[in-house]
Amino acid sequence: MRTAYLDCFSGVSGDMLLGALLDVGLPEAHLRAVVSALQLDGVTLEISRPVVQGFAATHVQVHVHHHEHDHVHRHLAEIADLLERADLDPAVRARALAVFTRLAEAEAAVHGTTPDRIHFHEVGADDALVDIVGTVAGLAWLGVDRLVCSPLPLTGGWVACAHGEVPLPAPAVCRLLAGVP
């Protein structure tokens, strides 16, 4: 069993995960091939290696070069179709779909509906697809079958999203973290 530990002292994001995977040996060419396999028009990766406060880092940005009237809205079935059409390893496809399914279940619970009726806003956008599928593919390439992370620094306040202003952590995030120490 190969375990990866994420030290999330300042939080975590898809771009941060992709950078960390590159730092521990995921070949850039493999990540770019995964992004290409998704067949998302106008999506590119910008990878840089800055020195931040004296420490080497890997910075990944997903650029979407077409207009997405705010965000693409996709249902779980559309994401499943997109993953099915992509030239991905079947295990990566299944794990990525499991991630999106878990997200749909959390969103459905807080919105009082079913997972198949959830339309993803931010998570259905092209950059989020790259973040999630790229992370799943990177973990698979590295042979990681167990992921552990430090406690997440949860904050308070409000954030604007497709449903208006919601409290932080967002209700679906709270649902995902239920029972996590």
Regions found by a protein language model. Give the residues of each.
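General beta-strand structural signal in soluble alpha/beta enzymes
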Residues: 6, 92, 112, 118-122, ...
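Functional cores that coordinate and move charged inorganic groups
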Residues: 114, 144-181
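Alpha-helical transmembrane cores and adjacent cytosolic helix/loop segments
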Residues: 102-122, 126
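Flexible, glycine/proline-enriched loop segments at strand-loop-helix junctions
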Residues: 85-94, 119-126, 157-164
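Conserved phosphate/anionic-ligand binding catalytic regions in large, soluble enzymes, centered on
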Residues: 6-20, 120-143
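Glycine-rich nucleotide/cofactor/substrate-binding loop typically near the N-terminus or early
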Residues: 23-111, 165-181
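Acidic, glycine-rich active-site loops and adjacent beta-strand->loop/helix elements
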Residues: 9-10, 37-39, 124-126, 151-159
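Extreme N-terminal starter segment of soluble prokaryotic enzymes
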Residues: 1-4
